[in-house]
Amino acid sequence: LTRSDIKLVPWSRGYARTKSEPNSVLFGTVRTEKREDKFTWVGPLAPTAQVVIGEKAANHEPESLSYFNDYKTITIRNDVAEQILLENGVARSNLLSIHDSDLIPRILDSDRADFWAYGERIAFHLLDKRGIADQFESVWTLQEGALYLAVNPETDPAAVQALREALAAVKRSGQHKEILAAYR
């Protein structure tokens, strides 16, 4: 595996490709019961919480997920946070489903949406890069879990084992903790 083998694609495309193409891997995938049989899993890479983020100044205090039916929430197409909202009765018409998480801080800052449902750690990292993280807070936790590498199940088991061994080596070296600390 070389750097040229790694391709950055929108989440939805990467998810579909990893499900259908042997020797493909999707980085940073939440392992859920619905996804369990679709992939071979390597990890865990990092803890994660899928949350709904809102502007602090708005003082949102939702008591249930139905609260979000009165607002517009940004999601990443096919992301676990989007799936959780839909499965719990939030109408698709109240979701602004996009393909690129890098666009979300700009959309939030422009008042085109009220909330963002996504992984808490990476969401606040992206907000921090725009210098607006202190204006937002997590207002609802959808799910806690872990991120894994999702590997197409037809991938050579030796390649999967090599990924597992590489992850174990990174964890043993201490680099894993350094990487996680950079995104807190």
Enumerate the language-model features and the residues they cover.
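Hydrophobic residues within well-ordered alpha-helices
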Residues: 18-19, 68, 107-109
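Ligand-binding cleft/hinge of the Venus flytrap
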Residues: 1-2, 42-44, 65-69, 78-99, ...
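Extended ligand-binding regions for polar small-molecule ligands
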Residues: 58-62, 66-71, 79, 149-183
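Short acidic active-site motifs
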Residues: 13-14, 103-104, 112
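Extracytoplasmic small-molecule ligand-binding "clamshell" domains
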Residues: 1-37, 97-98, 182
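Short Pro/Gly-enriched coil loops immediately N-terminal to beta-strands
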Residues: 40-53, 66-69, 88, 139-146
